[in-house]
Amino acid sequence: MRRREFVAGGIALAAGKAAFPARSLAQPAPPRIDHIIDAHCHLFIAADLPIEGFARKIMVPRSAQTSDLVARFVDYPGALEALVHAIAVQVKRAAPDMQTEIDTIDEFERDPRRKPTSAWRQDRDRQHLRSAFRLIWFSWDVFSDRPLSLTEGIALEVALEQIRLFLYQLIHEEFGKPDLTAEDREALGGLTPFQVDAIADELYSRDDLLGRYIRWALLYTRNRYELAEELDQLHGKVGQKSRIVLMTPAIVDFSKWLEDEDQLSIEEQVEVMARIACRRDGPRVHGFVGFDPLRQALYDHHRRKPGDKDPMAIVRRAIEVDRILVGNSTKTTGGFVGVKLYPPMGFQPTDNKHLPDDRFNEPAYLRSPDMGLGSQIGSKLDAALAKLYTWCRVNNVPIMAHTSHSFGPTTDYEDRADPTFWARVLKQDAFPRLRINLAHFGHFNKAVQYARPASYVDKCWEWTVGKVITGSSDAYAYADISSLGEILKTGPSRKIVECMKAFKEHFPNSDERLLYGTDWSMIAQEERFPRLLSPKPFPDVMIFFLRAVGYNDTQIERIMFGNAVRFLGLSKAEHEKFGENSTRARLEKFYAAHNLSSDWMRVFD
């Protein structure tokens, strides 16, 4: 089962039942863990992402056989491309710019009473959706960020006409009328703005696939600070106190692979996240900065645009605490705890020297000796990665790597996330103690398709991950169980429990190497996600699952909190062992530079 196939079992939870074997229901209540670290989450907004490139190269091809909406454009490929561009433009227009975000964060910090409620945020989401629908019906010409040619204008009009028909037909199907008559189609063009608003409200509140995706997409129009507040609520409270002590949201950088630059550069995203890191209450937010070896290789070999910055310099500025001169004023750098890598976009964690090969077809410009990297793409990617690994090892900086067979341009590209490559990295003399989190563990894709999945777990990537993370007692190799939505489905959860039990039996010390994570806000797109919040906080669902696997209370507490303390280097012992080259020392220096108390970190000692 793939990473994103989530949460049907949420309905069982809403009924007061859990999607685990009946025997587990007789067990004692899971332990109440009030100190939690979310080691894998995201707070990105639309301006942070290459939405158009991601949709065009990954989402649309994957949806061609399953999406009714995409199927409407089989005969209109130009219209579908126009639609993707139009949606990307509008979502990014709705997202706040960097200075607006920072000003809003400052306002919330000055007066916490001004923080918006969930009801207020949902009402604003509806307003955004109504505005978008009114544009679709009445002002389609604003759906572009540039003047359109006649051909482009016709393609966009065809695209929006198909969208109008699709949305209107959905409303009719709700009332048992699957086909539109000629009169219906005529009425479609005569709707009033208030009728269009009603369609928007209806679709926003629906619990079907489109409704979920609409609500999820609208999250990307919010402020990052608000997304952090939502993640806090997902974990529940102890009185008024947050259960989640620390969240470590990851920035992703893969726009060079998709040929679609982010609206906010990585450097600008770092600046906003560093401001959130200065919050005075609630869970602390210290992120992972995105690093792309392709961007580094292009920079190192002078394939850059005016104003481009050295990616490694951006990484260092995000993590190292220093005072730098910016214009006529000084600024404090730092606030991040690690680096995020995303191999399935096109690179392996090591051994890329064979690239380009017959399977390497994206992006095409890389083969050019003038614009790209010519025939030495692979060796230059390896050099960029070695530069990152060396710096991270010397400074005890953790790396989070996407290690799931998902969300690459092709299946071959997704193979490049294989944990076998990380085993090779850690066997190199230079990197045996590199801090690495192999993210998205626990799906057992090659085993759950069988009736007796436990017999096939050694064929799964998870088996390789087990060897990597338990191979040495003094290493810093871990795996997070973020985005493990199968645990909420009755059938899949039983299979995952079986696989995890077999894994636990073979790797008895695995509890010392697993990390808890949510993959927020990605999980918000999943089936019946809103119902998940009603019966119990998300971490309690994960705790219940771990108990069903057979982990005891002490082991579960390690997974939910203690292991992340060691992986991230947050304890006083880490400070004493590595001195200024420890995360604990860097964060204490960061808080002191901002005249903030670091007493909250005592919970790690």
Locate each region found by the language model:
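N-terminal export signals
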Residues: 5-26
